[in-house]
Regions:
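Beta-loop-alpha module in the N-terminal Rossmann-like domain of NAD(P)-dependent dehydrogenases
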Residues: 1-49
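Contiguous beta-strand/loop segments that form the cofactor/metal-binding neighborhood of enzyme cores
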Residues: 126-214
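Predominantly a Rossmann-like dinucleotide-binding segment in NAD(P)-dependent oxidoreductases
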Residues: 63-163
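Residue-level signal for alpha-helix termini/capping positions
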Residues: 24-25, 51, 77-80
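Rossmann-fold dehydrogenase core element
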Residues: 45-62, 82-86
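A short helix->loop->beta-strand "cap" motif at the edges of active sites that frequently abuts
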Residues: 26-28, 53-55, 179-181
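Hydrophobic residues in well-ordered beta-strands that form the structural core
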Residues: 9, 32, 57-59, 88, ...
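Short beta->alpha connector loops at strand-helix junctions that form conserved
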Residues: 33-35, 61, 190
């Protein structure tokens, strides 16, 4: 046994809520990987538990604390690119079975309670809404691009995963009314890409985010 003041929860997505609740009820400060819960009810329960325990509770993704995004928000506030017309965000990769360093079975990424939207989509949605605020309407198209996947490296190299239970390719649209809209691409269907992580298009100019933290 050991005592501690703060817990960092980096377990698999389906385990987040149970572990978070145990930590909060024990009076521990908490930093949780995303998503902290799979339903509004779970997240609300965690927030109320943190309030009751008087502890600090935060979660990833922390994009709005990034220097490049904070600088972009300042450029927008200063009117440097004019009125925002469109935001395009790309948060995709080829699937967790491609990770070079993986030593654990990645099957759970393709099972209910996980998937590309929870794993990757939250990044794009956080960045987009952090800049534009809440959307007035949201739409989505989704497909299963690879119903069977093969682990490429690591401990489970060569293992096949049945991946037909969840969508792995998403295009999410956000309507902000007037002239402004946003698109978030998310999924496990891009083995490689040179697409910018985010682009903000204004009436006077464009802000482009590249993957090394520069704009």
């Amino acid at each position: 046994k050991c005592d501690f003041e703060i817990l960092m929860n980096t377990t698999s997505i389906p385990a987040h809520h149970e572990i978070n609740m145990k930590a909060l009820r024990a009076g521990k400060h908490l930093y949780s990987q995303k998503p902290v819960g799979l339903t509004v009810e779970e997240v609300t329960e965690q927030i109320e538990a943190a309030k009751a325990a008087g502890v600090k509770y935060t979660a990833s993704p922390i994009h709005m604390l990034r220097d490049d995004i904070r600088f972009a928000k300042k450029l927008i506030a200063d009117g440097c690119i004019g009125e925002i017309m469109k935001v395009h965000t790309n948060v995709c990769h080829g699937g967790p079975e491609y990770f070079q360093y993986r030593t654990a079975d990645p099957t759970w990424f393709h099972r209910p309670g996980s998937g590309a939207l929870y794993d990757m989509g939250v990044h794009g949605l956080t960045m987009t809404t952090g800049i534009l605020g809440p959307a007035k309407a949201v739409g989505c198209m989704a497909k299963i691009s690879e119903p069977v996947r093969t682990v490429r490296t690591g401990t489970f190299d060569g293992m096949q995963i049945q991946a037909d239970q969840l969508y792995d390719n998403y295009i999410i649209t956000l309507d902000y009314g007037e002239r402004t809209m946003a698109v978030v691409e998310s999924g496990f269907c891009q083995k490689d890409s040179r697409a910018p992580q985010m682009e903000i298009f204004g009436t006077k100019g464009t802000i482009t985010f590249v993957n090394n933290g520069n704009i």
